[in-house]
């Protein structure tokens, strides 16, 4: 199994404001780094529910569940957070939710998962290989406009449509089935703009985000977390690129701002507080230089922490 170093471990767990008898959710179990750290600080009455859609993560979680009765693992996308917690009868009782967004190091390092442009493997990229369509299946059917839009929107790729045209032209003779096949095509088409970044980085990120509906999942899990947190419960979220962080930042700001009224309208103090459901507990936190030196994946990570102060208004 690939070694996985958990990013911002102490900081993200501290962002939950742990109580020894609290009930917490690790929405992105992965290989269990955050979960084990949380369990290490909970007492006998504490409880941790973890979620992951990766079957290999579930195997690790099920082994931990056998060892620790305080721990429960759920197989599914984290967008189902509110539904899972309601089924457990714990809505409104959750003291903290931790989310570590994006793809994990073991997923990238396992060539068979198809996430890596450095290792040859099947062009899959699904977080859950048992569900949805693979990257190869999508690239075989999508047109130039769709591929170009995905690369530009989710990868912020300058050469998005150049790459899209080449994929559509080349696939008529040879379908794109392998990761290095796609990575080498992109490398031929695109100049290396950033010294430490492979030319295929942005395109692989974009296709992965699209195949897994990652940004839509983030919107849903943030809404779900707000719904199931107890008043005073805390949300601790690690993002790994600007698209993720933008969603998290805007969500927290919107919930801090509350209901919007027409400009110039005289408001009471109660009206000014109306609709405010979260307050940010700290400025966005980035890893230390020491952590980045030890784990280069940490370099782009950002942690945001907020606390629930009121129930959201019903629609």
UniProtKB/Swiss-Prot annotation:
The keyword Transferase applies. The keyword Transferase applies. Its main location: cytoplasm. One of its GO terms (biological process) is rRNA base methylation. It is found in: Cytoplasm. It is an enzyme of class 2 (transferase). Keywords: Cytoplasm, Methyltransferase, rRNA processing, S-adenosyl-L-methionine, Transferase. Its EC number is 2.1.1.199. One of its GO terms (molecular function) is rRNA (cytosine-N4-)-methyltransferase activity. It catalyses: cytidine(1402) in 16S rRNA + S-adenosyl-L-methionine = N(4)-methylcytidine(1402) in 16S rRNA + S-adenosyl-L-homocysteine + H(+). It holds the Pfam family Methyltransf_5. S-adenosyl-L-methionine binds at residues 32-34, 52, 78, 100, 107. Belongs to the methyltransferase superfamily. RsmH family. HAMAP family: 16SrRNA_methyltr_H. Specifically methylates the N4 position of cytidine in position 1402 (C1402) of 16S rRNA. This is Ribosomal RNA small subunit methyltransferase H. It comes from Psychromonas ingrahamii (strain DSM 17664 / CCUG 51855 / 37). The gene is rsmH.
